[in-house]
Regions:
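Helix-loop junctions at membrane interfaces in 12-TM secondary transporters
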Residues: 47-61, 70
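A membrane-interface helix-boundary motif in multi-pass transporters
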Residues: 111-137
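Loop-to-transmembrane helix entry/capping segments in MFS-fold secondary transporters
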Residues: 82-96, 123
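Loop-to-transmembrane helix entry
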Residues: 1-14, 125-127
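Structural signature of the two symmetry-related core transmembrane helices
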Residues: 32-47
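Multi-pass alpha-helical transporter architecture, strongest
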Residues: 131-166
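Intracellular juxtamembrane helix-capping segments at the cytosolic ends
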Residues: 69-83
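Helix-to-loop junctions at the C-terminal end of transmembrane segments
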Residues: 15-30
Length: 166
């Protein structure tokens, strides 16, 4: 099942990042696109952690793939907020954050998985790492939403009308 699920994830992510992300972000705007992507990831991770049957994970893969729109939406907003002379520094900082997360993430989530299945844990809960990931993603969504505040999203169809009225 692992090989099949990874193949499905790869296909779904290619579809989302290869074509749907731009369309969804274009329709919703960057801020709402980021929120949708992070919310989809939160729901999928919580679902993976709570799914009592393997087939349920397959059903959640589509929801999880929608999380792939968060990155492009965030990247677009961040890129627009800095001048051309700062783009390299910003992209370098984003890559550094991604690298640190790529190192720390597996250590944290492997440890949390071990806690969930460990002999000394009460009741054994192998989905603990996924619930933890859902919680961290939800926290990130709340923080991002607050940080964006009144972000002027040029892709948001309602933004132009609101800014004229103000």
């Amino acid at each position: 099942h692992v090989g099949a699920s990874l193949a499905i994830v790869g296909i779904l992510m290619a579809v989302v990042q290869g074509g749907l992300a731009g369309r969804i972000i274009g329709a919703l705007g960057e801020k709402k696109g980021l929120a949708l992507g992070m919310l989809a990831t939160t729901v999928a991770m919580a679902g993976y952690g709570l799914a009592p049957y393997g087939w349920m994970v397959y059903a959640l893969l589509t929801v999880g793939a929608l999380g792939g729109i968060a990155g492009p939406a965030a990247q677009a907003m961040i890129t627009r907020e800095v001048g051309a002379d700062e783009q390299g520094a910003v992209q370098g900082a984003l890559n550094s954050i991604t690298s640190v997360a790529g190192i720390a993430g597996p250590l944290i989530w492997t440890w949390l998985f071990a806690v969930g299945i460990g002999a000394d844990s009460q009741g054994r809960f192998p989905g603990l790492a996924f619930i933890g990931a859902a919680a961290v993603t939800l926290l990130g969504l709340v923080m991002a939403w607050r940080a964006m505040g009144n972000h002027k999203d040029p892709l948001d169809k309602d933004w132009g009308a609101k800014s004229v009225e103000q």
